[in-house]
C-alpha cells in the first residue's frame, strides 16, 4: 500500500486529499519503526479482524466499489444525476418552503471554508465569530417567539418537537404520562415524537383541540401555529386551561408567520419549536435545516443541545461561550437532558444572517407578500365556487374539492407545480417567498379557476404588536458590502481548517474538498421538497441507492438507512432497532445496555432515550474492556441483556485485540452488539464491524466521509444493520418505499442535500484510496505519539505499542508536579496558531490528538514543535523561573490589545507571549479575547445579543 506520488496529482484525487506524500510517509514510518503502511496495519489491527488485500489488489468489502474517478469525471456524473431530477415549483408546504437565498450569504457562508470547516466552539477564545453568529440566531428565535431563551439550533422540526415533549415531561407539575397533540400538527412531526414517546412510556392523545382539552390528566399539550392545514387558531384560552390542569404547552411555530401573528410567548406558551428553513436555507430534499427550541428562562437547565451565553474574559471584556454545559450528554451521560451533540450550526448562521440582512421590516415585508399571494389564491378559488376551508391562514390554503383531488394535483403537475393532496376531498396549496403571480394563475387554472378581481374576505391576521429584531445586529448590515465585511470580520475571529489543522481527537477534522462541496448548491438538489413525487427525483434516489450500497460494502453490514441527521440520531435509531427486535421476539424485558466506562456520554444518553437501563462495564488501566467484568455483567443480566455498546477502535484510541471475543460473548448471552462508528476513519478498508461481530453501527458522514462539521453541524449519522434488523430501520409516513420502522427525522432521507459530498468522496477515492486514507491517518497519529511521548507520555497503546488514528497525551503528572493544567496548554496553543486537541476526554487532564490523513507532514511537525516548545515553557515554570500564577501558559491566550497595553508587569516578555517560536514559525493567529470566565457566564446567564454599550 502506497500513497500516490505528486506526479499524477492532476488526475488522482487521493493525492489531493491525503496530506503526506510517499516521501513523507516513509519519514513517518521510519520514526514509528515499521517498514510500510501494510506493516503498520499488521502491527496495529488485530489479525482476526484485519482485512488484508487479496490477489485482486483490493481489500474485501471494497471490491465492488467503482474505480476512482477524477474530480472532473465525478462532477460530470453528479451533473447527470442532478439533471435527471425535475425542479418543479413546490407549493406542497407541510413545513418545507422554497426560499430566496441571498447570494452574499451563499458565497460568504455556505461556500466559505472559514464557516463550514470549524468544529463545535469548545475553545471559545478562538471561536468568537461563530459564537456571535449563534447568539444572533438565539436572539432571532427568542424575539420572534416571544420567549426569553432559545438554544443554538436543533436538528430539524421533528426532533425539536420530540425534545419539547420530553422537556415538558421533565418540567411539568403533572405526574401524568400523557401528552395531548392537536390534530393539525404536521404528520411527520407527530410521527417523530411518537417514536420518541413509545420507549419512554409516554402516551400520545391526538385530538381536535378547537373542541377543548380531553378529560383526564396529561403533562403537556402540543399545537401548531399555523396548523398543517394552514389554519391560524388563537390558542390563548386553551393554554390557560392547560396550565390550570398542571400541564405545559408547546407550540410549533412558523417564524416567518410570527412577524405578523401574535407569538407563542405572548399567548402563554411555555415552549416554542420549529424550523428556520425558510430563512434562506433551501429545502434540499429534506435538509439540513436548523430547528429551534425556545422557552422561559426558568426552564433553561432543561434545554437540550448547545446554548451560547455571554461572559467576560480575564480583562473584563464581554465574550461568548457555550453555557450550562453540565446539562449535556458528554458530562451527564444517561442523566443528560438529551443525546444531541452535533446540531445545525452552519444553517443557524445562515438563518441568522438572513434575518440580519433583511431586518424586521424586510422579514415582515416578505411575510406580507407571502400572505397576499395566499389570499389571492383563496379569492380566485372562492370566486370559482371552490370551498376554502379556513378563513384565517398565513401561507397555506386548504381547498375542499370532493372527488377531484387527484385530477387537480395532476393538472397542477402539468403546469410544473406540485401541490399537496391531503385526502380524497382536500388539496392544500402553500405559498412562499418564491411564489409569483404566474404561479398563482397556474394553480388556479388547475382548479379550473382564474384570478379574482375582488379580494379575499378573510380576517386580518396581523395581530402582532410587539417589536422584534431591534438590536443593531439586525439593522446595520443591509448592504452587501456591510454584510460581506461583517461575515469576514466574524470569520477572522475563529480558527477553522482554512487556517490550521484542528487535531481534535474523536472528531476527525479532515479535508472537505471543494469538488465534494460543489454540487450542494445545485438547484436540482437544493430545490427538491422531501415529499415531492418520486418521478421528480430519480437522480437523487439513484445517488442515495449508490451511497447505501457503498456504505454496506465498506462496513460489512446488510443495509443502511440515511435518515438520521446526526450521529446522535443514528445511535438512537440503531438502539431503537435493537429494542424493537427484542420486542418482536417476545422479549420486551431485555432492556439492559452494557457500556464501557470509557464510552462517550452520547452512548449512555441514547440508551436512556430508548428506555434502556445503563450498566457500566469496567476497563483496565490500559483502557481495554475488562473481560472478566464483562463476563460478570453478562451473567448478572443474562435474562435482561439487550445490547453492548462499544466504540471501535476504542475511545482510548487503540485497537482492542479482544473485540471479536467480546462480540461473541455478548451474542452467546442473547444480546446484540452496537459498534459505535465514531472512529470508523481507522477502519475503512482495514476491518468491517459487520463482519467482526457488530449487529448495528452508526456512521458519521461528517467525520469519516467528508461532510463538513460546520462549526457544530450539519451532520449525517446513517445507521447500518445486519439482515435480522433491516425491517426495524427508520420508516416515514410519506415514504412507503422505506422499512416500516419508526422515523427519527422529519424527512425520509434526513439531510439529503449533503449526501452528494460523501458520494463524491467515495467515488473519487475508490477502494485503494479509502484504505490508504485510513492507513495514513493511523501513521500520522503514531508519528505524533512517537515524537511527543517523551514530552507528554502517551497514555494508551495497543499490544504492539501502536495507537489507532488518535493518541492521548497525559498531562496529569505535569499538573500534579508543576501546576500547569490541560486548560493552560490548550489556551497557549492558540498563541502558537493552533486549535487545541480534545481536552479531558475520555480521561480528565489529558489531550486527545487526531491529525487525520489530510494534514501534511509539515503541519504535523509544526504542531509537534509547538507542543515541545510548550513543554519547555512548563519546565521553566517547574524550575521557578515563572510562577504558576503568572506565566505565558496561565496568561494565554494573548490578544493584540493586551500586548499593546502601556503596562506589562509579567515576568515573560511580550515577544514570548505573542511569538513563542518567532515570527517566521507560522502565520499569526490573534485571539480576539483573553481566557473566558466560564463560572461567571453560568451565574449571570445572558443568551441574547448584548447592547452595544457593553463593548465600549
UniProtKB/Swiss-Prot annotation:
The chain residues annotated with the modification N6-(pyridoxal phosphate)lysine are 703
Under InterPro entries, the record lists: GcvP (IPR003437), GDC-P_C (IPR049316), GDC-P_N (IPR049315), GDC_P (IPR020581), PyrdxlP-dep_Trfase (IPR015424), PyrdxlP-dep_Trfase_major (IPR015421), PyrdxlP-dep_Trfase_small (IPR015422)
Any idea which UniProt keywords this protein has? Oxidoreductase, Pyridoxal phosphate
Q: What is this protein called?
A: Glycine dehydrogenase (decarboxylating)
Report quaternary structure and partners.
The glycine cleavage system is composed of four proteins: P, T, L and H.
Q: Which organism is it from?
A: Mycobacterium leprae (strain TN)
- The keyword Oxidoreductase appears for this protein: yes
Q: What is its EC number?
A: 1.4.4.2
Name the job this protein performs. Answer: The glycine cleavage system catalyzes the degradation of glycine. The P protein binds the alpha-amino group of glycine through its pyridoxal phosphate cofactor; CO(2) is released and the remaining methylamine moiety is then transferred to the lipoamide cofactor of the H protein.
